[in-house]
């Protein structure tokens, strides 16, 4: 692999993870409000710690390139589930965009899962 490809793979992981790290951190700072929003959408607020762990922890693991394929698959599934549960009012333009943003991110995660993390990752250390 060349340096450009290696750098692009790392940059891609960082960019894909950024939204999840930021979302997980914001859920910590707005914990009660997020639980209420989840409950209003029919999702038990008790699941919030798992959501935060997946968003924040999964995002950081993706950046580090640790267990990358597994994390990418988990984030792909989470992205599709989140689209279906929280952004399903496709008649609302904002929700339409959010729905397909999540679906597009799932596609990016599936590519990462299929191709692996690249050279600049903990998964490839020592190789």
Predicted features along the sequence, with ranges:
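Extended, low-polarity transmembrane helix blocks
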Residues: 1-29, 36, 45-53, 57, ...
